[in-house]
A protein has these predicted regions:
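Active-site micro-motifs of SAM-dependent methyltransferase domains
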Residues: 128, 145-146
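N-terminal auxiliary segments of SAM/dcSAM-dependent transferases
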Residues: 1-27
Length: 151
């Protein structure tokens, strides 16, 4: 099995059966007024933090995030762009995209300001981004640069 296949399978399994110990932390990066993070999103936080600072997220930036995990970062980014498809989440693992979709339903229930359609989930990878040129203001990733090799 190739490196990319192995990585895909690890994240597929993590989407189907959340693995709290898979990565560095389950704590939200930011604590913002009126933002509540569903427990399942915290359990599925397979990142090590954010490469984005909240002060850089002004004027409704169109955002792209690669490696959706349980959707926690996407929810946090949506706090700053409360528009339909204001945040694009990209992942190669179908099961992770589906888990995030489900988690956004829970996020809507506990965050009156949040709508699932603020996040546009897309299948794809960082080497071939399924977005138009010059359409993104802020881009970030979920600690995945180690798997961006062709094989």
């Amino acid at each position: 099995m190739s490196y990319l296949e192995t990585t895909h399978n690890v994240y597929k399994e993590a989407a189907l059966t959340p693995d709290v110990g898979l990565c560095c932390t389950t704590n939200p990066i930011w604590e913002l007024p009126g933002l509540k993070i569903p427990r399942i999103m915290q359990e599925m936080n397979y990142g090590c933090g954010s490469t984005v600072h909240a002060r850089d997220l002004t004027n409704n930036p169109k955002m792209l995030y690669v490696g959706v995990g349980g959707g926690m970062e996407l929810l946090q980014f949506s706090y700053f762009n409360r528009q339909k498809a204001g945040v694009i989440g990209l992942d190669v693992v179908d099961e992770m995209l589906e888990a995030s979709r489900k988690n956004f339903i829970e996020a809507e229930e506990i965050n009156p300001w949040f709508k699932s359609n603020f996040v546009d989930l897309r299948k794809g990878d960082a080497m071939n981004l399924p977005v138009d040129d010059n359409s993104i203001d802020v881009a970030a990733q979920n600690c995945l640069f180690n798997i961006f090799k062709s094989d």
